[in-house]
């Protein structure tokens, strides 16, 4: 007869194993952050706060860094990475705002309003879109959206208005945000759909019994209940958006230029170059010490941004719970 192991002993072993695995994961993350920041520190130390400021053409600055002596005592370059930071914030923020709105509306439609046969079609399609490689989205952008914007949305007069500042070709902030929105939306839709399905049916039935219409029930009951899931989906999507490089290199223009809102509508047609694209495009220069340190600095900014976003989302749930806005 088999000897039975007490459930408490089994639970204790499982807890210890999971705790050990969690500790290993935490250690790996800490080592990764320390390694990247350590390798990036010389770039920050050499430039000081000017690293985050604006200055001459950042592409020319990166060229000077590539040709700079390897000895830190003889560094002669300066880097002002504001155009890259600004482009990263614009593209990621724009795509995240558009993506959250689109994903929430799409998830509500799938769960609350779509007929059952249509739901069985839409959900696998959403999961499939979430798994499509970014280079495919980049090809669609290059072959479809970039020519469309360059040939039909940007007039000759608009191109000439900024010709002495930047060249408008279709590779633009608008295309980058549009494609990135389509890339990150399926991830958020899938997570929000799962959360909406977990909302107790009794809550909605109780609201309907009180005479509340269907849309008001969805917004006041279902959406309110899944706010933590929406936050989690947004954080996960923002992490992917921050790290996206290949697709953005293909459609954003890859020019170290800070799009100017004072240019009016032309602003959305101006090219940009986010940090992730700068890392990929300059990856062959890792062997050049000052250039490699600069690329590590770009990576450190992206890594720390993702960590702070995750921490921010975690602490954002506390006031929601305090005021009874989460289950």
Q: Where is each model-derived feature located?
A:
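Non-cytoplasmic
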Residues: 139, 147-148, 230-268, 276
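Transmembrane alpha-helices
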Residues: 128, 132, 188-192, 199, ...
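Interhelical loop and adjacent transmembrane-helix boundary motif
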Residues: 249-303
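Transmembrane alpha-helical segments of polytopic membrane transport and secretion proteins
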Residues: 1-22, 313-327
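Periplasmic/extracellular loop-to-transmembrane helix junction in inner-membrane transport proteins
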Residues: 2-17, 37-95, 115, 281-292
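Transmembrane-helix boundary motif in ABC transporter permease subunits
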Residues: 6, 94-126, 147, 313-322
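Membrane-interfacial helix termini and adjacent extracytoplasmic/periplasmic loops
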Residues: 46-82, 138-182, 252-253, 263-267
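Transmembrane alpha-helix signature in integral membrane proteins
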Residues: 79-109, 234, 302, 308
């Amino acid at each position: 007869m088999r000897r039975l192991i007490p459930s408490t002993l089994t639970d204790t072993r499982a807890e210890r194993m999971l705790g050990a695995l969690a500790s290993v994961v935490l250690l790996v993350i800490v080592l990764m952050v320390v390694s990247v920041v350590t390798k990036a520190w010389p770039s920050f130390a050499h430039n000081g706060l000017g690293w985050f400021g604006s200055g001459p053409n950042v592409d020319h600055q990166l060229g000077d860094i590539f040709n700079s002596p390897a000895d830190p005592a003889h560094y002669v370059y300066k880097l002002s990475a504001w155009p890259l930071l600004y482009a990263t914030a614009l593209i990621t923020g724009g795509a995240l705002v558009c993506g959250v709105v689109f994903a929430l509306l799409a998830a509500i439609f799938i769960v609350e309003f779509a007929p059952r046969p249509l739901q069985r079609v839409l959900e696998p399609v959403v999961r499939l879109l979430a798994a499509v490689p970014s280079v495919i989205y980049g090809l669609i952008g290059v072959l479809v959206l970039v020519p469309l914007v360059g040939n039909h949305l940007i007039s000759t007069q608009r191109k000439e208005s900024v010709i002495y500042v930047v060249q408008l070709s279709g590779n633009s902030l608008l295309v980058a945000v549009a494609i990135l929105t389509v890339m990150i939306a399926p991830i958020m839709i899938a997570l929000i759909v799962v959360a909406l399905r977990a909302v107790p049916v009794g809550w909605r039935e109780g609201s309907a019994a009180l005479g509340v219409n269907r849309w008001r029930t969805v917004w006041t009951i279902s959406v309110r209940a899944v706010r933590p899931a929406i936050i989690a989906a947004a954080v996960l999507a923002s992490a992917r958006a921050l790290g996206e490089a290949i697709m953005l290199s293909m459609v954003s223009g890859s020019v170290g230029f800070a799009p100017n809102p004072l240019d009016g509508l032309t602003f959305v047609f101006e090219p940009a170059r986010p940090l992730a694209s700068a890392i990929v495009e300059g990856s062959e220069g890792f062997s050049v010490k000052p250039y490699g340190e600069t690329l590590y600095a770009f990576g450190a900014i992206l890594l720390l941004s993702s960590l702070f976003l995750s921490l921010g989302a975690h602490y954002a749930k506390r006031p929601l719970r305090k005021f009874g806005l989460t289950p």
